[in-house]
Every structure is written in structure tokens, then in C-alpha cells.
UniProtKB/Swiss-Prot annotation:
HAMAP family for the chain: CitD (MF_00805)
Phylogenetic placement of the source organism: Bacteria, Bacillati, Bacillota, Bacilli, Lactobacillales
Protein name per its UniProtKB record: Citrate lyase acyl carrier protein
Family that this chain belongs to: Belongs to the CitD family.
Alphabetical list of InterPro entries matching this protein: CitD, Mal_deCO2ase/Cit_lyase_ACP
Length: 97
């Protein structure tokens, strides 16, 4: 699937993550800001890539501002951003959820 518009999900509050998805052309590109990036950057990126893969999104620019979010929060925020970016908020993919 292809991203139709730029979308944001999440907040900048403690224990949350803000994810912005935009159209990409060369795979999935990340801009990650996190106090724990040295320790968890690969895990954060992996969770987001896996979630994008569930929707068949292969090209995207992902800007992530992490404030210590747990894996399940990262996945939930990514799912929300994807649905907004695909303009499918009213038509969720129940197989993915």
C-alpha cells in the first residue's frame, strides 16, 4: 500500500512516542530521537518496520520522537499513524489488529 498523506500519532508526554509517517521512495527511512536510542533504537525501528509490513507499506519516511514508550505503545501509535496516512480511519484492517 502507498501512503496517501502525512499523518501523526502520539504525544510528547513521558512513556509515549510520537510517530509521523510521510511518503517515501526508497524503502523505510528513519529519523529517530530518543534518550534511549543507543540501547533501543534497533528494537524501536524493528517494531515499526514490522507494523508497516502488516499493511504492505514498503516506502515511508518515519519520524519518531520516543519518550520511553513500551513496545505495545509503539505498535499502537504506528497502527494509528498508518490508518491516518492511508486515509482509512473509518475502515480499519481487522486482520492486522
Amino acid at each position: 500500500m502507498e501512503i496517501k498523506k502525512t499523518a501523526i500519532a502520539g504525544t510528547l508526554e513521558s512513556s509515549d512516542v510520537q510517530i509521523m509517517l510521510s511518503k517515501g521512495t526508497v524503502g523505510v527511512e528513519f529519523d529517530l530521537v530518543s534518550d534511549v536510542a543507543k540501547q533501543f533504537a534497533d528494537d524501536i525501528k524493528s517494531t515499526i518496520k514490522e507494523t508497516l509490513g502488516l499493511y504492505g507499506i514498503e516506502n515511508a519516511v518515519v519520524k519518531v520522537v520516543d519518550k520511553g514508550a513500551l513496545d505495545m505503545v509503539i505498535k499502537a501509535r504506528t497502527l494509528t499513524a498508518i490508518q491516518r496516512a492511508l486515509d482509512a480511519v473509518d475502515q480499519p484492517n481487522w486482520e492486522v489488529l
